[in-house]
């Protein structure tokens, strides 16, 4: 049985504080931090809840946006042993562009031997799998149209090839833990259902 605790989301819930972003703590066969939000707030809220993140086995960063991986450096400072899983290309420079205004929304690159760049679906064991590459049969969210990444000397629409999700098998059930689902939630569900029929 897995227990999922939301450490960060947009709306605060007393006594926890909120910020734009997401961070979840999954306790089960493995203890996994899924996304960090944009700052150290995930750790502050975990402390309020009595959760010891120093004992987490792993961290997963769903994609290369500040509101999901901005606290990665802080996590690695409070946990000196957890492996970190992040999609290949997640540290590319990313921007939101609206009304000709360009705003950086990427995450600072972190270099460590503990960081594992995920290039394809990766079983972690104990019923946990990192899923990558989702196809596009169902299209993607309209909100993606303002999101770009650096390529050469310019910007191109973000392909979200770095996006990863966590799939948890629990008996006959399959649970999908995702960040923003920039690849499209229906595409993600279809990919998971093909891997876990």
Name these PLM-found stretches.
Residues 8-11, 36-39, 64, 89-90, ...:
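Active-site metal-binding loops of divalent metal-dependent hydrolases
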Residues 30-58, 142, 149-151, 185-195:
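Pre-active-site segment of Zn-dependent metallo-hydrolases
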Residues 32-34, 124-133, 175-178:
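Short hydrophobic-aromatic micro-motifs
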Residues 41-92, 193-197:
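Active-site metal-binding motif and surrounding structural segment of the metallo-beta-lactamase
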Residues 66, 94-97, 186:
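Short, charged, surface-exposed secondary-structure boundary motifs
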Residues 90-164:
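Metallo-beta-lactamase
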